[in-house]
Amino acid sequence: MTLQIGVIGCGAIGQDHIRRLTRKLSGARVVAVNDIDPQQARDAVTKYGLDAEIYGDGHEVVAAADVQAVLVTSWGPTHEAFVLDAIAHGKPVFCEKPLAVTAQGCMRIVEAEVAHGRRLVQVGFMRPYDEGYRALKHVIDSGGIGAPLMLHCAHRNQSVGERYTTDMAITDTLIHELDVLRWLLGEDYTSAQVVYPKKTRHASAHLADPQIVLLETASGVRIDVEIFVNCQYGYDIQCEVVGENGIAKLPDPPAVGLKHAARQSVEIMTDWKERFIASYDVELQAFIDGVRQGALTGPSAWDGYAAAVAADACVRAQQSGAVEPIAMAERPAFYRG
C-alpha cells in the first residue's frame, strides 16, 4: 500500500518534506497540497512533478477522500486547528513544531486524541532520530556510566537575523533540547531558570545573547544549556552526560581531519539543516511506516505538550530572573508505556 499524503503549507519546510516524499523516501506519495499563497502551491507541484490536487484551504486537504494522512508544515499558529481537524477525520497527521503555540492548545490536541482512542499525531522533533543521540541514549540506558547526575549542553548558531528575539532563544532554539533531553533521560522537568552572561557585540540591540538555561528534572538531574546564536564560527550542538561512574558525550558529525601548513583542523558545519538532514529523512520515513503498520512510535502529542509547558516556564524565567516551576498535568495512561 502506498500512503497518500496531503501537505498543508508549501513554504521552505513543506517543500523540503515534499522533496523527501517524492525523491528520497518510500511507501508514500503526495496527492494534495495547499498553501496560503496559491502560487507557492502551484510551484511545488511543478517543481516536484506531483500528480496532486491543489486546494484553496487546508481543511479541504484534510477532508479530501484520497488523502490518507496529513503533513502540517504551515504557519505555526495554524497548526492546532489542522491537527484537530485531522483527528476529527480519523487521519494520521505529522505536524512540524510547534504542535500548537500554547500549552493549552497542545492539551486540546492531547484530549482530542485520547477521546479518539488511537494515536494519530506525530510531532516533528527530529533529534531522537539522530544516530549520535541514539548512541548516547543507548549508553545512558545501558547503565554504563551509572545514573545521570548532570548534563552540560550547548546550542550554537553562526548568526541569526534581525527579527530573532530574546524569547525565540527558547521557542525556536532551546525547544529542541527541551524535547531531546527529556527523551534521553526519560523524565520530566520540574524547574527552569535563565541567566544572562556578558552580551556579545555581534547580537542586535534588542537581543540578549548568549543565554544559559538551568533545568532540573524530577529525579534531581541538573542541566545547563548554553544558547549562543551569534557564535560566528559555525553550527555546533554539544551534549555531555555526567554519570555516577563516567561521562558520555554526543559525538560530533563525521568530518575529515586536515593537517596542512603546520596546522591541524576539522571543518565545522554552518547549516542546521545539514547537521540533521539524515534525521529529517528517518523521522518522516518512521511516520510513513508507522501509519502503514497501524502503530505510530515517534514523538507524540504528549511530547509536544511537555515541550510547550517547559518552554513557557523558560520564557517566564527569562522575564523574572527567578527559578520558575514547571507544572505539568498528569500523563494520561494513553501515553504511557
Swiss-Prot record:
Catalysed transformations (reactions): myo-inositol + NAD(+) = scyllo-inosose + NADH + H(+)
InterPro entries linked to this entry: Gfo-Idh-MocA_inositol_DH, Gfo/Idh/MocA-like_OxRdtase_C, Gfo/Idh/MocA-like_OxRdtase_N, MI/DCI_dehydrogenase, NAD(P)-bd_dom_sf
GO molecular function, one term: nucleotide binding
Signal sequence region: none
Pfam families linked: GFO_IDH_MocA (PF01408), GFO_IDH_MocA_C (PF02894)
Keywords: NAD, Oxidoreductase
EC class (word): oxidoreductase
GO biological process terms on file: inositol catabolic process
Oligomer and partners: Homotetramer.
Biological function: Involved in the oxidation of myo-inositol (MI) to 2-keto-myo-inositol (2KMI or 2-inosose).
Record-given protein name: Inositol 2-dehydrogenase
Gene expressing this chain: iolG
